[in-house]
Amino acid sequence: MTVRVEKNGPVTTVIHSRPEARNAMDPDSAEELVAAFTAFDADPDASVAVFFGEGGAFCAGWDLKYASTLEGQEEPLAALNFPADDSPTPRGPMGPSRLVLGKPVIAAVAGPAVAGGFELALWCDLRVMEQSAYFGVYCRRWGVPLIDGGTVRLPRLVGQGRAL
């Protein structure tokens, strides 16, 4: 299990726990995060979720070591296990970033929140950052776009001029 859920009264804490990979996302983590946030949204006793990455990193984006194992496969996207378009629970590469929840989620960001990790932070309703925290979109250097809503969410949050 790479995701832990802790409850303290109306507060649900969702912890992404892959510190050895700087909490980089892989398909198992993505599925577990979707399940955790879907359960949080359905829980009548839960009012707010706090989301953070264990070990001093919020999320370093997609797990490139995992991605390298897909090389040479005829259908590499099939290994990512994305639900079909008619799925009642939408899931993107970063997991919950396409969910629409009825309760607020707070990102508690420490260390890097880069590429897809930045997109996860943008998905949250509020972002609280430690002094060690930073956002980045380094994947653009190699022509890899943000694919989980970041290019839409960032301008909505900070304005187009600042987002550029």
Question: Model-flagged regions — what are they?
Answer:
Residues A30-E32, T38, L64-A110:
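An acidic, glycine-rich surface segment that forms the CoA-thioester-binding/catalytic face
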Residues F58, L64-A67, V144, L154:
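Short clusters of hydrophobic/aromatic residues that line enzyme substrate/ligand-binding pockets
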Residues V14, F51, D63, L120-A121:
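Hydrophobic/aromatic residues within transmembrane alpha-helices
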Residues P96-L164:
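Crotonase-fold acyl-CoA enzyme core
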Residues M1-G56, S68-G72:
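Conserved CoA-thioester-binding segment of acyl-CoA-metabolizing enzymes
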Residues M25-D26, W62, E71, C139, ...:
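Short, flexible helix/strand-to-coil boundary loops that buttress conserved ligand/catalytic motifs
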Residues P27-D28, W62, E119, G149:
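Generic recognition of short, well-ordered alpha-helical segments
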Residues G56-A60, K65, V114, G136:
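Short, active-site-adjacent cap segments at secondary-structure transitions
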